[in-house]
Amino acid sequence: MKLTQGMRTIAAASLGLAALLPPALAQQTTKVDFSDETVGAESKSFLSVVGVWRVEQEGAKKVLAVDGRQWKEGQSSAGIADKARALYGERYAEFLDRVQAFAYFPYTVAKDVPDFSAGEIAVRFEGISGRIDQGAGILFNLKPNGDYLTVRANPLENNLVLWKFERGRRSSVEWVRNTPTATRQWHDLKVRIAGAKVEGYLDGKRYLEHTLPQPVSGRIGLWSKADSYVYFADYAVTPAK
């Protein structure tokens, strides 16, 4: 078929537009809804590894809360051995040893996503209290040895940080300042992953972009820090095609 000049123009415009769009995402988005869960209990959709995580009532809506008001470093969650087995099967021992040795930061793991390597992870959060921290993070790239990455916001610091936790030590990978994040207000946090490329969004604006040495692959969840008391809601996972 012979292309007319008009058809060529349309085709060129379409290609140009495609280059500007993010990688195509699958239609199937997994959303976590806490409406049928029991207030005061751990969520059925997550396995709490470090710290205290439970379903709470916030107005007419149920949310997942991390409660660090009585935080003690080294506080792995109740039933951690069984949870480690549920996450990693026969390889649970290494994960369990790392968690018990380095339970420095509260985190919980999504049950139904055994491996995430590309796409989007989003959540809404509200910092309720915390004198030291009000950390709200999306955890990803969790390995059987306990290493992971997290992009976290913090209403006390107004920054967005990509942290790496490796061999029991935390270090910053990318740090972005001046990201307005008021406490006691709901905010949208999103991570977009494509291979080794990580983008961090806060309230719809991209603040962070970093290329890792290796592609992302591992379990995902939520992360926090110290005495943070934070609500989470509308956790959604959209894998790339």
What are these regions (language model features)?
Residues 166-188:
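Short, aromatic/His-centered strand-loop micro-motif at the edge of beta-sheets
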Residues 22-26:
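Sec/Tat signal peptide C-region and signal peptidase I cleavage site
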Residues 69-166:
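Secretory/extracellular carbohydrate-interaction modules
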Residues 33, 215-241:
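Ligand-recognition surfaces built from glycine- and aromatic
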Residues 41-91:
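Extracellular glycan-recognition surfaces and repeat-rich motifs
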